Amino acid sequence: MDINIRDMKFSHDGILKRALLDIDSWCVDKGERIFVYGPSGAGKSTLLNLVSGLLSCSEGEISVLGERLDKLNSRQRDRFRANHLGYVFQSFNLVPYLSAIENIDLARNFSTRKDRLSNKLNASELLDSLDLSSEDWKKPVSLLSTGQQQRVAIARALVNSPEILIADEPTSSLDQQNRENFMSVLMGLVERKEMTLLFVSHDMSLTQYFTRVQALNDFSKTD
């Protein structure tokens, strides 16, 4: 089991009666591809941030890959995330004046799992598999198209060979063609590398790609 949440509550203000998320039990098995949907403000991004350790729960247990995140301090959670999780953000979160390979380096340098040479080869392989030419690797990402920037974001999330990939509305800024291309590339990499995928989106047309589709309010008692 890759993700196991029990008796978990999260509140921004610490008042649990006004918990944004209240989950009795929720599990994700290894290799599952989970699509979570729900209205804006329901707590979908908060769920991802809790699972990735960007946030700490107010009460209860969050186990990811057998590690109790609720028992770790902020620095330990950051290290765990760098070593075991990949994150694709809605807004890409790329550094615009850095090249594609330099943006990937930022993620790689946080990980303690692999030496620089093996990661460098992995980064080159990823960029090549995502149809980015060696010339594109060297350009500031601000000069790349939206679709190319999204591919750089995927490569950055995957460069440390994460066991779990987390994606927060990653297709929201893409047109239909780029959205289809993105999903084809993403799912191909996820299946080839046998990763668990936790994906949040409003776009129900994407559900065909997933092994489980679940509304957030099916497992979270939110007001």
Task: State each model region's role.
Residues 165-168:
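Catalytic Walker B motif of ABC-type/P-loop ATPase nucleotide-binding domains
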Residues 60-68:
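Conserved ABC transporter NBD signature motif
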Residues 140-144, 148:
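Conserved ABC ATPase signature
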Residues 98-107:
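Short coil-to-helix segment of the ABC ATPase nucleotide-binding domain corresponding to the Q-loop/switch region
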Residues 161:
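Conserved catalytic motifs of ABC-family nucleotide-binding domains
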Residues 52:
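Helix-to-loop junction immediately C-terminal to a conserved catalytic motif
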Residues 68, 117-135:
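Conserved ABC ATPase "signature" region
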